[in-house]
A protein has these predicted regions:
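Auxiliary, metal-adjacent structural segments of Zn-dependent hydrolase domains
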Residues: 1-27, 34-38
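Glycine-rich loops and low-complexity Gly/Arg-rich segments
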Residues: 29-32, 53-54
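Active-site recognition of the HExxH zinc-binding catalytic motif
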Residues: 42-54
């Protein structure tokens, strides 16, 4: 089961991506055709870092 978190604005960028964090802690990116895979992964890692801080 995947959980959609939210549309993520990239730092200093206007291209959004949709991230889902899976139950096993991995993540899935959706709607990333307009950005490079590396940037999408970075955006999700930033989101995951924020979530796990709390």
């Amino acid at each position: 089961m995947e959980y959609i978190i939210e549309r993520i604005p990239f730092p200093y960028d206007t291209i959004p991506a949709v991230a889902a964090i899976n139950k096993d802690g991995s993540y899935t990116i959706y709607e990333n055709a307009l950005c490079s895979e590396a940037r999408c992964e970075r955006a999700v890692r930033l989101l995951v870092d924020e979530i796990t801080k709390e």
